[in-house]
Amino acid sequence: MRIIPLSIVLLAFSAPAVAQVIGKTFPEMEAETVEDKVVSVPQDTKGKFTLLGLAYSKKSEDELNGWFEPIFYKFIQKTTGLMAGFGYDVNVYFIPMFTGINAAATGTAKRKALKKVDPQLLPYILFYKGELKRFKEELDFEKKDIPYFFVLDQNGKIVFATSGAFSESKLDQIEEVIE
């Protein structure tokens, strides 16, 4: 009988800590495109819903890459024909974060992205170089090996947060918030 209550307690405490950030304004972050254009989040994204995917380790970046294709087809690719009016008007950015000693690798990562990433995706990838501590504290980044996703409303307030590998259920939850 003790197994059931213990498993319920463990399940309750395993809920993503990122849920604690809902309602907060996303902290200011300046990041760059592969062409070195600076984008300030959330300042430059106001007026539209914004989906952000952040990763700050090689392993989490690999998981972040698993989100590229499904998010591209769901939110970025423009529909044509009969479905032309049913696309989403949303900002989408995938942000690998280069901090500490890894900050020096930002330029190399940009050049690598130019060579290896589908050109259609490049405008949606931002490179952050700077400190991590503030974001870890304000966004409840607890595990470095997973990516974190945030949906911001038109004013930059976090209205949804999730983390980890891609799943259809997570994508459905994001879509519900954006609709």
State each model region's role:
Residues 6-7, 17:
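Cleavable N-terminal signal peptides
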Residues 101-145:
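Thioredoxin-like thiol-disulfide oxidoreductase module
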Residues 134-137, 144-179:
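Thiol-/selenol-based redox modules, centered on thioredoxin-like
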